[in-house]
UniProtKB/Swiss-Prot annotation:
Keywords: Coiled coil. One of its GO terms (cellular component) is site of double-strand break. Belongs to the IMPACT family. Residues 225-255 form a coiled coil. Residues 228-250, 280-297 have a biased composition (Basic and acidic residues). This is IMPACT family member C14C8.09c. Residues 228-297 are annotated as: Disordered. InterPro entries: Impact (IPR023582), Impact_N (IPR001498), Impact_N_sf (IPR036956), Ribosomal_Su5_D2-typ_SF (IPR020568). GO terms for biological process: GCN2-mediated signaling; regulation of cytoplasmic translational initiation in response to stress. PANTHER family: IMPACT FAMILY MEMBER C14C8.09C (PTHR16301:SF26), IMPACT-RELATED (PTHR16301). Pfam families: UPF0029.
Length: 297
């Protein structure tokens, strides 16, 4: 099979035409014009991975009014599964050079270089114009892809930032609620111990790190105040017991003026059971306060 036959083989496989969804201008990327001694070169690149669209693209170039008066429409195409071929259209060796550009740039689709002949033979330099315009059209396609990739990356990053900001805002609100509840607990304990209360603070605008530190500080404060309240209750109870013991001791001493039976009947006598009962009441009140604190948390 000679070279000319190999160029035309793909176009003669009888693939049925599909309906194009875009015009030639919409589906292709065009290079800048190169003019040399009145000959003008222009290339188009149509990205595609579907070989069934090849006859459609070739027909679009064939019937384009903008290319009606050009002298050559050199073509090459490359698709997955090693489907590739070219057509010189009278400019010998040009199709192979276009196919080499597709391979080197590692893209799939069709590249077409058109030439308006200016009347002078250009020699080998014409191949530079052919390959340069072809590469330029592919570069434009890659540039658009890169821009789209950057936009997609930016959209993704923006979405992640929004999600992160939303999570961070939610966490900040949670910390503020926790610290506000802790402040109420601290003030309840301080009030019971006759201590000055914490001043009301607006925690909005503080960083998460600061809020975490404040939350840890409030937890330590509550633990310390609880211990102090329990210790105070124990001391109060012990004082009451000592007071009772002192009264019992004084009652046993001699020469104590004993009131008459009538008068003594009006005097309430404190017994160990009475003092214990009163201390128990105080202890229950302290326990209730601690339980209320735990509920506040």
């Amino acid at each position: 099979m000679n070279k000319r036959q190999s160029q035309l083989k793909f176009g003669n496989e009888g693939i049925s035409l599909a309906v194009p969804k875009q015009s030639l201008q919409e589906c292709s990327y065009m290079s800048n014009l190169i003019t040399d001694r009145e000959s003008t070169f222009l290339s188009y690149f149509v990205p595609s991975k579907d070989p069934k669209m090849l006859p459609v693209y070739r027909f679009m170039f064939q019937e384009s009014a903008d290319l009606k008066h050009c002298n050559h429409k050199m073509q090459a195409w490359r698709f997955p599964n090693e489907i590739e071929a070219f057509n010189d259209d009278g400019e010998e060796y040009s199709g192979q050079k276009l196919l080499n550009v597709l391979r080197k740039e590692d893209v799939y689709g069709m590249v077409v270089c058109v030439r308006w002949y200016g009347g002078q033979l250009l020699g080998p330099v014409r191949f530079q114009h052919i390959t340069n315009t072809a590469k330029q059209s592919i570069d434009k396609y890659k540039s658009v892809l890169e821009e789209e990739r950057k936009k997609q990356l930016l959209r993704t990053e923006t979405g992640l930032l929004r999600q992160s900001s939303s999570r961070s805002s939610s966490l900040l609100d949670q910390r503020i609620r926790q610290i506000t509840a802790k402040d109420k607990t601290v003030n309840l304990l301080r009030k019971t111990l006759n201590r000055p209360l914490l001043h009301e603070v607006d925690y909005h605008g503080k960083s998460l790190e600061i809020l975490d530190m404040l939350l840890q500080s409030r937890n330590s404060m509550i633990s310390s105040l609880r211990s102090e309240l329990q210790e105070k209750n124990q001391k109060d109870k012990k004082k009451e017991v000592n007071k009772l013991e002192e009264k019992m001791t004084n009652a046993k001493e001699p020469n104590v003026n004993v009131p008459s039976m009538k008068a003594s009947s009006a005097i309430s006598v404190e017994t160990p059971e009475t003092i214990e009962s009163e201390a128990s009441v105080d202890h229950k009140e302290a326990s209730k306060i601690i339980k209320d604190v735990e509920k506040e948390e």
